[in-house]
Regions:
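Outer-membrane beta-barrel translocator/channel fold
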Residues: 112-120, 218-272, 276-299
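Transmembrane beta-strands of outer-membrane beta-barrel pores
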Residues: 66-74, 108-116, 151-157, 187-193, ...
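Outer-membrane beta-barrel "beta-signal"
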Residues: 201-205, 210, 269-272, 302-317
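Residue-level signature of outer-membrane beta-barrel architecture
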Residues: 94-96, 135-137, 175, 189, ...
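Hydrophobic, lipid-facing positions within transmembrane beta-strands of outer-membrane proteins
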Residues: 86-92, 127-133, 149-153, 165-171, ...
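Repeated loop/turn-to-beta-strand initiation elements of outer-membrane beta-barrel proteins
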Residues: 98-104, 141-145, 180-185, 210-213, ...
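Membrane-embedded beta-strand positions of outer-membrane beta-barrel proteins
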Residues: 62-66, 104-108, 147-149, 185, ...
Length: 317
């Protein structure tokens, strides 16, 4: 999901810490899932019309990732105490070649956050279960979405109603400026976000065969690539989503829209075990976690804490 994770973290540019941080991420990477911008040596605007059999995209793509964020206190949370978080996500896609290096990907994505402490204002879980409709580019190694549509249910706790349905859309075309520099420009559209339409863009710069700078939101990184199977990087990450809250005794949070986000930085290792199987491990520091009831208030932020993450990606050819 990766991708998928996600992102969905569009926010009105207001004079607040959260707004400034999101604007900074947007300017630096300003790239919501615009990963087409770094499709290796192949230009997005110059696809191969008849790729060789060895270079065709996979028939199926799977991704499983899990992570743990150590406990930290949330401001203005009363006696909530130190709150830890578990998160996991599963994505499965069936890939259909349209023409050249362009594919239609259809599948499902399930993501869930579980929290060690909760109350009426802070749910014990956040869940999304969505269909995946993607128009993507195959670089020879990975798929990079140009258009992503994710119809599904996004809810807190176990409260699922007709108001839990959402339809986030992301449009992120890419362009080749030089053999080593790609840029993207597009937008994210989500009625559960504020603003509903948010501009996005960014770049990927291949410095040389060993170093790469990817200003790609939501996971920018500076990478060292000693060989074709190994990548070591220093990077950031912004993740989260918007969810429909269930009934509470507080009019500010009762059936309200909750936007949850995390900002963090860490060191990661991505290793290709064999063609089609990648394992990625990351450890770092979560700068803050934010609970934002975007249309009714309140906004609550956590203190920082360590986190660890493990991703497994499988492509079946």
């Amino acid at each position: 999901m990766h991708g998928r994770n996600r992102t969905t973290l569009d926010r009105e540019i207001v004079v607040s810490k959260k707004g400034k941080l999101k604007l900074a991420w947007s300017i630096l990477g300003v790239l919501c899932l615009g990963q087409m911008a770094f499709a290796g040596g192949k230009a997005l605007v110059e696809p191969s019309l008849t790729p060789s059999a060895e270079n065709l995209g996979s028939l199926w793509s799977f991704e499983l990732n899990g992570e743990y964020t150590f406990g930290s206190h949330v401001e203005k949370s009363g006696n909530l105490g130190s709150q830890a978080e578990y998160r996991y996500e599963i994505e499965a896609l069936r890939n259909f070649r349209i023409t050249g290096d362009y594919y239609l990907q259809l599948g499902v994505d399930y993501e869930r956050y579980d929290f060690s402490r909760s109350n009426a204002q802070f749910p014990y879980s956040l869940t999304s279960f969505s269909g995946e409709i993607l128009f993507s580019y195959w670089s020879g190694d990975s798929f990079y979405p140009v258009i992503r549509i994710e119809p599904g249910i996004y809810y807190t706790r176990d409260h699922v109603t007709e108001n839990s349905f959402d339809l986030p859309i992301r449009i992120t075309p890419g362009f080749k400026l030089t053999p080593n520099l790609y840029v993207i420009a597009g937008c994210s559209i989500d009625v559960y976000s504020n603003p509903v339409v948010f501009p996005i863009g960014g770049f990927n710069w291949k410095i040389n065969d060993k170093f790469n700078f990817r200003a790609v939101f939501p996971r920018p990184r500076f990478s060292y690539i000693p060989n074709q199977n190994l990548e070591i990087y220093l990077g950031g990450e912004l993740l989260g989503n918007s969810y429909r809250n269930g009934p509470t005794n507080d009019r500010r949070t009762n059936n309200a829209i909750l936007e949850y986000s995390e900002e963090r930085a860490g060191v990661g290792v991505d290793y290709t075990l064999r063609k089609g199987i990648d394992l990625e491990a990351i450890a770092g520091w979560t700068i803050e976690r934010v609970y934002d009831y975007i249309r009714s208030g309140p906004i609550n932020r956590s203190r920082g804490s360590p986190y660890i993450r493990l991703d497994l990606k499988i492509d079946l050819f």
